[in-house]
Amino acid sequence: MAEEVARSFDDGLHLLVQAGTGTGKSLAYLVPSMLHHKRVVVATATLALQHQLVERDLPRLVEAIEHEQGVSSSYAVLKGRSNYACLHRIREGVPDDQGVLVDVPEGSMGKQVLELRAWAEEQAENDGTGERDHAPRHTDRLWRQVSVSARECLGRSRCAFGDECFAERARDRAAESQLVITNHSLLAIDAIEGVPMIPEYDVVVVDEAHEVTARITQAATDELSTGDVERAARRAQRWVEGSEADDLDDAAGALEGALAQSEPGRIDRIPADLADALVLVRDAARACLGAFPKEGEGDADAGRSQARAGVQEVFNHAERMAADLESDVLWRNDREPARGGPQLCVAPLQVWGPMRDKLLRDKTVVFTSATLMLGGDFSVVASSVGLKPSERIPTEPVGEVVDESSGPDEEVLPWRGIDVGSPFDYGKQAILYVARHLPSPGRNGLGKAQLDEIVELVDAAEGRTLGLFSSRRAAETAAEEVRARLPHLTTLAQGDAQLPELARQFVEDPHTCLFGTLSLWQGLDVPGDTCQLVLIDRIPFPRPDDPLMSARQRAADQSGGNGFMQVAATHAALLLAQGSGRLIRSTTDKGVVAVLDPRLVTARYGGFLKASLPPMWTTTDPAVVRKALARLASSAG
């Protein structure tokens, strides 16, 4: 893998690398990155991988190469501005709803804010990073009291604390480093949205690449609610002398009325009253922006800057939604009243086009993950990131690359794909059990047959079970059943405590079950006897009412493709592969992946899904599986 990555850097061809758990893929791209003659950016999806790179892999690599002549071992971590404490906000105060700077909130929240402020000042004194990940325990709401978004920031030259700023110092370190570690979202903002966030680079490694399209979609999703517009109007009232801020507040009322008349879910055709309300908000926000007093030289005021930023955000989101672009999907999302009530959301219908035009044409990109071959092939993932299957060339190039699907003016983007395998012998270490005898899952959650099956399997394994469920309700129902019928085991459900605490309990006591939803499907690494059974209640297709997925599926059908296979089955295959990957994490692990959904072996699409999984020995016989689990449990002790 290291040789192929280095070759890709040198010849400028894009590369997809499937590298199974345990192959050491991070070192396989970090070594060529250190040896490359220009800066390399590594983008990850999760904080856990960033921590692994920065706290484990890179220090070991630097120690190994520090005496090599002509090799730069410098590296830096770069995140979005809101991930760093803001010294201006900490020292000058936070704007309230009227834009007045308030020192500290009252009550217990005020005490926690003071703790965060003290931590940030200590970081500033000791040349710390001021990163959120290193801060004392806090909520999102608390963190907003000590941080700002990029739009709210005064800017280095206009801020009294610009030279001390944690975010600016992180950018300075990145500009002096050979290697920049960042995340998918920041990469998207820099490369696709064209907002310069990362120092100049020509090569990108996208790790956890199976996540990249979802993360880029997330970064390009905008939200707008009545509360957002009202808040922006209230903050603007202190700075705008005319009626423009009041007009914006009136527009919020029109939006509230139009939202109340609309239905939850995807909006294919914007109703006239909602379209009118969005235009009203857009125009009122534009007028309000024009009414803000101009800032003079050295006349920086955080309250004014942040009030204006709020109005600018409302304008941008309303303008995008009112445009009703075919390239966007609009929907109404219903939140609890305490969390703000209904909101409008807009997201790109697809991201492969922007990725191809804005990232792949300008940079050399290496995509890597343990899960890149879906249905046994790279084509699905390649297409999702903007590379055409017809542009793939053999690992050893032969002849000229020809893409017959490209027009005369369209640039061909050749790429290679390699699977470097796995150190694990899945055929001997793992069993895939499909409960063919069970009824297909219904809409009413887990039935008696599924609950009986879960209890029997968990009993045979004597705990040691990670349950991956399609909904929080299903996870909690299963947990209640196992607790009632197997009281000698410890059964934990997601939500009982914070995920790190649940994971710690799961590891410490082998006679434990941990049941949860999506964050457990991809974020848990538990090698050893702790986890010998991974339960999956149903094939994880997206919900039929998911606005974005359903729109993408319909668009694929309309373009002559198979929307179900291209969108729903691909989504399910990716999650199934990730979920199954929780079982075998080392060469000594053994266990069972149990799928309680018979469609994996009875439906036509089952072959595609199975081809996306590790090559485990497969059975549909429950007696065989229970005996295997009992043997594993007795040998584990």
Regions found by a protein language model. Give the residues of each.
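Signature of the SF2 helicase/ATPase Hel1-core->accessory helical subdomain module
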Residues: 35, 48-51, 55-59, 151-152, ...
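A contiguous, basic/glycine-rich beta-loop/short-helix subdomain that forms a polymer-engagement track
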Residues: 144-178, 193-195, 288-436, 445-452, ...
